[in-house]
Each structure stands twice: as C-alpha cells, then as structure tokens.
Amino acid sequence: MRRNKRERQELLQQTIQATPFITDEELAGKFGVSIQTIRLDRLELSIPELRERIKNVAEKTLEDEVKSLSLDEVIGEIIDLELDDQAISILEIKQEHVFSRNQIARGHHLFAQANSLAVAVIDDELALTASADIRFTRQVKQGERVVAKAKVTAVEKEKGRTVVEVNSYVGEEIVFSGRFDMYRSKHS
C-alpha cells in the first residue's frame, strides 16, 4: 500500500528514532520508495545522515558514561571508554596546536590529551591528577593524528588513588607516554 508523503514522513521519523543506525537503502526498501525520496524526506525533516546519527548516539553515550568531567573539557575526541579500565581518544594536530615557525605540536597539547583521558577513564565524579611521570619520544607535526590509549593499572579505592598509564601514537610510533597517579574520592 502506497502512503502519502505526510504519513511516510511520520513513519520515517518514528523508524529512525527507534533504529538510528538504519541506512537510507533499508528505509527505501521498507517504504517502497527510492533512496533519493528518503534523502529528500530526511532533509525536509532535518534528520541527519547515518554517519552523523551514529556520531550523535556515540557522543550521547559517552556523555552519560564520563563522570569526572564534561566531554567538552576532554582534549581530543574519545572514541572508546570503559570506566576504570581503558579509553582511547584521537587528536588531529591543527595549526592552532603547533609552533608557527616549525609546525611542531606544542607539548602541552599532547599532555592535555593524555591527562584529560586519564581523568575521563576514572569511574568517579571527582578525579584529579596527583602526579605524572611523562616522556615525549618524538616530535608531532601539523596534520598528524595522535591516538592516545589509557589503561588503568591499579585502583586503590580505600586510599583514593588510581594509576593510569597513557601511551600516545602517530600510526604505530609512540610519541608520548605517561604514568598518571590520580586522586579520586574514597566513597565511589
């Protein structure tokens, strides 16, 4: 049965709300219309494309998971997070991150990415850096992508401490490493 445009758009909205990862191709098959019709309907309804919907769901999920700071306080983009276990973030090195004379990334950006990831991985409302032992192992240049991987290596809730090790990579090459001794509240 062919639906009119208004009915189809209402059902389209409901379907995408229920299953945000559905493709335009699947929607076209479900509603018996062309992919172009689905795209036009999405545009009229201001529904983003699949890639954008996936990103929105991921950000919402991370916003709900990260307890110790808000996502806009994280340096880089968190792409994986398991509280009190491990986390991964990506930082694209842009012009604002580098020295203008040589296009080498300023060290505090690499430290900030690693430190904010160490804070974000803590399963507690309060997480602060007590101390850090860090090493920069090679220069990072504008245009490179830094992937920071944090791993919780020790949790002492009764002492209010957690140790997080962070290694940052460009490709397979390590560019930064750090051991962060984190303070957390004792009643988490």
Swiss-Prot record:
A single MF term (Gene Ontology): DNA binding
Leader sequence segment: none
One GO biological process term: negative regulation of fatty acid biosynthetic process
Superkingdom, natural source: Bacteria
Pfam families recorded: 4HBT
Swiss-Prot/TrEMBL keywords: DNA-binding, Fatty acid biosynthesis, Fatty acid metabolism, Lipid biosynthesis, Lipid metabolism, Repressor, Transcription, Transcription regulation
Sequence similarity: Belongs to the FapR family.
Name by which UniProt lists this protein: Transcription factor FapR
Gene that encodes it: fapR
